[in-house]
Swiss-Prot record:
Domain of life: Bacteria
Catalytic reaction annotation: isochorismate + 2-oxoglutarate + H(+) = 5-enolpyruvoyl-6-hydroxy-2-succinyl-cyclohex-3-ene-1-carboxylate + CO2
Subunit and partners: Homodimer.
Name this protein carries in UniProt: 2-succinyl-5-enolpyruvyl-6-hydroxy-3-cyclohexene-1-carboxylate synthase
UniProt-listed Enzyme Commission number(s): 2.2.1.9
HAMAP family noted in UniProt: MenD
Cofactor: Mg(2+); Mn(2+); thiamine diphosphate
Keywords on record: Magnesium, Manganese, Menaquinone biosynthesis, Metal-binding, Thiamine pyrophosphate, Transferase
Pathway where it operates: Quinol/quinone metabolism; 1,4-dihydroxy-2-naphthoate biosynthesis; 1,4-dihydroxy-2-naphthoate from chorismate: step 2/7; Quinol/quinone metabolism; menaquinone biosynthesis
Pfam families, per database record: TPP_enzyme_C (PF02775), TPP_enzyme_M_2 (PF16582), TPP_enzyme_N (PF02776)
NCBIfam families, alphabetized: menD
Family: Belongs to the TPP enzyme family. MenD subfamily.
Record organism: Shewanella sp. (strain ANA-3)
Swiss-Prot/TrEMBL GO biological process terms: menaquinone biosynthetic process
Length: 573
């Protein structure tokens, strides 16, 4: 084949891939610059059905795609060149696999004759993500390979997929056509003649039915299950599962609803949100130990006390509801797992429990904790928990909240206030890494342009500094709240043998501030050390059409000392 024909066929394959992915539900494509992925890049540049996002760093790009996929509830494509560019996606792919987020990696690659022979920027890319992505290896574009094969390969790999797919795309040079004119997928092309019908409509070449895995108990099984003292636990639930239905379920059965930070219900007035703290409240814990039935929605619970409660209790019946087959119980309890989303399961024909309202006293204990937190956090010294409660109390309607790992998400889980207007809440708690958090929040903010707040620790932000470049491109509010306690101060809560080891090998104080970093990327910046200034800056930032940074300066020991004091008060209640 002449070289010009090679470049044209490369581009045609790239266009077929991007067009079919758009038909399969992809709305966004995230792209990093590189030469070997040129056929994909040029095809994406002409693709009008996809919104394009560009970033120079593949690690941040992968996490941005993760955020876009979380917010859109749809697969997101990622285009990279060959070599370590692909490997830089690994952390985001791991997180996506563990949390069932569909990312589609399109990696440009050298042809077979340039692998393992010292050719530039050539590594073995197939299976680079090991167990964390479904692998598809495409051959180099060849006029003897029917275009239908390419489409059916994509359809089988991507349709109904809830986890990452890696599509490795080998290309021979030349990669750049001599000109870019007209439509890439020209219906007059002899190569595309078998696809005339496909070219005339907008549906995927192969149309798979939805793979529903709904399983549900019989009416008799439900009646027997609710006959006793039970609790309902809302773990990690996505907004599209409509977790609000669990409120009505709890009220109908007459069992308390205990909510995790990631349930979308942590601050709901009709739920028991302070479960982590109630489990160290003597009277509340004694009451909860009377339960012999549990209904768990989702998994990946934050609270170690709640995880321990599930492990230690002698359950007569343990049901767990998951949207797909998974194993999300580190205690390995014997249980019945039902496949359904939360709303589907909550809307079954439930009966009133024979022990309805058995735990109503929990509401009183929950209210006691509310008063304790108002006195000792809201009206106490300035600190991390106070800032998190202020954010949770002042969020406008339709806002999105992304809570960073390590200490921020735990403080929210322990101390978030009750509120009638709560934001859609996101986390990265699959692998719970502190990398890529800003990039993920940028992806969430970019999808629909809703006001978004990110609560992130200083070490997490240092991990993801260059994602400020993504943030500065946003045109809707993203408030980046950096809780700077000068190091990894979650280790203050862990039993490190002595303070010297804690300081030298775990906390890693850095003495850095973020003002110059914000200035480098031309982001509005404020540094605060009191609640009044924070609230003023926060409200102003929510009205700013773009990203801005608020750095909260606190001491290394403020949060850990406050947690210890609150734990003591709760235990003495």
């Amino acid at each position: 084949m002449r070289t010009e024909n090679t470049a044209t066929l490369n581009l045609m394959w790239g266009a077929l891939i991007l067009e079919e992915l758009a038909r399969l539900g992809v709305q966004h494509v995230c792209m990093a610059p590189g030469s070997r992925s040129t056929p994909l890049t040029l095809a994406a540049a002409q693709q009008t059905k996809l919104k394009r996002h560009l970033h120079f760093d593949e690690r941040g790009l992968g996490f941005m795609a993760l955020g876009l996929a979380k917010a859109s509830c749809a697969p997101v494509a990622i285009i990279t060149t060959s070599g370590t560019a692909v490997a830089n996606l690994y952390p985001a792919i791991v997180e996506a696999w563990l949390t069932h987020v569909p990312l589609i990696v399109l990696s440009g690659d050298r042809p077979p004759e340039l692998l393992g022979c010292g050719a530039n920027q050539a590594i073995v890319q197939p299976a680079i993500f090991a167990n964390y992505a479904q692998q598809v290896n495409l051959p180099t574009p060849d006029a003897h390979i029917a275009p239908q094969m390419l489409l059916t390969t994509l359809d089988e790999a991507v349709a109904n997929q809830t986890r990452p797919v890696h599509i490795n795309c080998m290309y021979r040079e030349p990669l750049y056509p001599s000109e870019m004119s007209g439509t890439i997928l020209d219906s007059e092309s002899p190569y595309l003649r078998p696809l005339q019908t496909w070219l005339q409509h907008a549906k995927p070449y192969t149309q798979y039915g939805k793979s529903e895995q709904l399983s549900s108990p019989s009416d008799d099984a439900i009646m027997r299950f609710v006959h006793g003292k039970g609790v309902i636990i809302a773990g990690t639930l996505t907004p599209e599962q409509d977790p609000q239905q669990l409120i009505a379920l709890s009220q109908k059965i007459g069992w308390p609803l205990l909510t995790d930070a990631q349930s979308q219900l942590r601050q709901h007035p009709a739920a028991i949100g302070n479960i982590d703290q109630l489990l160290q409240h003597p009277k509340a814990r004694n009451l909860l130990q009377e339960a012999d039935r549990v209904l768990v929605f989702g998994g990946r619970l934050l609270s170690k006390r709640l995880i321990a409660y599930l492990a230690e209790q002698n359950w007569h019946s343990y049901w767990q509801v998951l949207p797909q087959q998974d194993r999300l119980d580190p205690s390995h309890n014997a249980k019945h797992i039902w496949h359904a989303n939360a709303a589907q399961f909550a809307q079954l024909n439930w009966y009133r429990s024979s022990s309805a309202n058995w735990a109503n006293t929990l509401v009183t204990y929950n209210d006691e904790l509310h008063s304790l937190f108002v006195r000792n956090i809201d009206q106490g010294e300035f600190g991390e928990a106070q800032v998190i409660r202020a954010i949770a109390n002042t969020r406008p309607l339709e806002q999105q909240l992304f809570i960073g790992n390590s200490l921020p998400v735990r403080l929210y889980d322990m101390y978030a206030p009750v509120s009638c207007c709560t934001a859609t809440t996101y986390t990265n708690r699959g692998a719970s890494g502190i990398d890529g958090l800003l990039a993920t929040a940028c992806g969430i903010a970019a999808h629909q342009g809703k006001p978004t707040s990110l609560i992130i620790g200083d070490l997490s932000q240092l991990h993801d500094l260059n994602s400020f470049a993504i943030a500065r491109s946003l045109t809707s509010p993203l408030v980046i709240i950096i809780l700077n306690n000068d190091g990894g101060n979650i280790f203050n809560l862990l039993p490190v043998p002595n303070e010297e080891l804690r300081s030298d090998y775990y906390r890693l104080s850095h003495g850095l501030e973020f003002g110059y970093a914000a200035a480098m990327f031309n982001l509005p910046y404020n540094q605060v050390d009191n609640l009044a200034d924070f609230q003023s800056c926060y409200h102003e930032a929510l009205d700013y059409q773009g990203a801005s940074v608020i750095e909260v300066s606190v001491s290394q020991h403020q949060a850990s000392e406050q947690i210890a004091a609150l734990n003591l008060w709760v235990k003495q209640s």
